[in-house]
């Protein structure tokens, strides 16, 4: 028996599809990458990771059989202390309590990403979570690299 299920994941197409789409009401400029799944448009999550979770929880997540892809990026410096790691664990527990199960995280510094873009020969082992899959950062097309860099770099001061 075949069945169609709803999904918001645009795993490999959010960058090329964005090149064909005009501006959107969320502030995304024409020809820029679309958001990945239910993730905020790059740079628009200005109120922190807890606010993102509370927004995503308002979606009918239980009706999306294929899951709701949520990408978030955190600063490595915000994960160094036992207290900050405890806050990150609390954020994960909150996500589960809210019914959000398909979370993906990059713990990457913007400075490192910019340096990898400028000097790819030095970063062959830099792996990133793209949208449903991992890839070597330097192997991605420049627009995909920019989209990952444009994701807000969060702390865990929830």
Model-derived regions: residue spans:
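Acidic, glycine-enriched catalytic cores built around paired aspartates
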Residues: 1-158
